[in-house]
UniProtKB/Swiss-Prot annotation:
<feature type="binding site">
    <location>
        <position position="156"/>
    </location>
    <ligand>
        <name>Mn(2+)</name>
    </ligand>
</feature>
<dbReference type="InterPro" id="IPR014710">
    <property type="entry name" value="RmlC-like_jellyroll"/>
</dbReference>
<keyword id="KW-0479">Metal-binding</keyword>
<comment type="similarity">
    <text>Belongs to the germin family.</text>
</comment>
<dbReference type="InterPro" id="IPR011051">
    <property type="entry name" value="RmlC_Cupin_sf"/>
</dbReference>
<feature type="domain" description="Cupin type-1">
    <location>
        <begin position="62"/>
        <end position="210"/>
    </location>
</feature>
<dbReference type="GO" id="GO:0010497">
    <property type="term" value="P:plasmodesmata-mediated intercellular transport"/>
</dbReference>
<feature type="glycosylation site" description="N-linked (GlcNAc...) asparagine">
    <location>
        <position position="71"/>
    </location>
</feature>
<dbReference type="InterPro" id="IPR006045">
    <property type="entry name" value="Cupin_1"/>
</dbReference>
<feature type="binding site">
    <location>
        <position position="112"/>
    </location>
    <ligand>
        <name>Mn(2+)</name>
    </ligand>
</feature>
<protein>
    <recommendedName>
        <fullName>Germin-like protein 5-1</fullName>
    </recommendedName>
</protein>
<dbReference type="GO" id="GO:0030145">
    <property type="term" value="F:manganese ion binding"/>
</dbReference>
<comment type="subunit">
    <text>Oligomer (believed to be a pentamer but probably hexamer).</text>
</comment>
<dbReference type="GO" id="GO:2000280">
    <property type="term" value="P:regulation of root development"/>
</dbReference>
<dbReference type="InterPro" id="IPR019780">
    <property type="entry name" value="Germin_Mn-BS"/>
</dbReference>
<keyword id="KW-1015">Disulfide bond</keyword>
<feature type="binding site">
    <location>
        <position position="110"/>
    </location>
    <ligand>
        <name>Mn(2+)</name>
    </ligand>
</feature>
Length: 221
């Protein structure tokens, strides 16, 4: 199978980057042409300090070209192209990622606290959705060439219900959008969320909570 082309995804992220940015949304405005992230700097700022020696490679990343390995519990994998992988994104307020899904694969419910996400489907068919603060679910089945938007901070998911692999390119209006998985946040936090909080919140017993925690606990090597 020929590898899907990316032009439409590139157009999508460029359009997102060109949208007017209110002072309350996305990352802060840049104050110079470039500020390539110094990922080794001990200076703590809202973002990353600028490094002095800059090269073309600071603005280049080829990690989205190939499909990721979906051989895991959820049958999906996210390959990020954020400031940690592409230092030239520092202060520019955009990033991307590629998400690959095995047949039946799920990108489980999660949020991006610092960014709105827009996905462009490269191949396959996905059931996607997000939930508002009023507990209203908006869901849609999307296929190759389609675009869907997940508003900033809202819980959302993607599920491949097809019998062939699927893939999307995601665009974000943040250099580092952050990801908070609902299940991992509640049941695999360190230190642990007290059982009493979870049993009362989910109206289940301690045994059920401990069972979920054991399944989500990091695997020992």
């Amino acid at each position: 199978m020929a590898r899907p082309s990316l032009p439409c995804a590139v157009v999508a992220v460029l359009l997102l980057a060109l949208l007017p940015t209110p002072s309350t949304a996305g990352d802060p405005d840049l104050l110079q042409d470039i500020c390539v992230a110094d990922l080794t700097s001990a200076v703590k700022v809202n973002g990353f300090a600028c490094k002095a020696a800059v090269t073309e490679d600071d603005f280049y990343f080829k990690g989205l070209a190939a499909a990721g390995n979906t051989n895991n519990t959820y049958g999906s994998v996210v390959t990020g192209a954020n400031v940690e992988k592409l230092p030239g994104l520092n202060t520019l307020g955009v990033s991307m990622s590629r998400i690959d899904y095995a047949p039946g694969g799920l990108n489980p419910p999660h949020t991006h606290p610092r960014a709105t996400e827009m996905v462009f489907v490269l191949q396959g068919t996905l059931d996607v959705g997000f939930i508002t603060t009023a507990n209203k679910l908006y869901t849609k089945t999307i296929s190759a060439g389609d675009v869907f938007v997940f508003p900033r901070g809202l819980l959302h998911f993607q599920k491949n219900n097809g019998d062939t692999p699927a893939a999307v390119i995601s665009a974000f209006n943040s250099q580092l959008p952050g990801t908070q998985s609902l299940a991992m946040t509640l049941f695999a936090a360190s230190p642990e969320v007290p059982d009493g909080v979870l049993t009362k919140a989910f109206q289940v017993g301690t045994k059920e909570v401990e069972k979920i925690k054991s399944r989500l606990a990091p695997k020992k090597r």
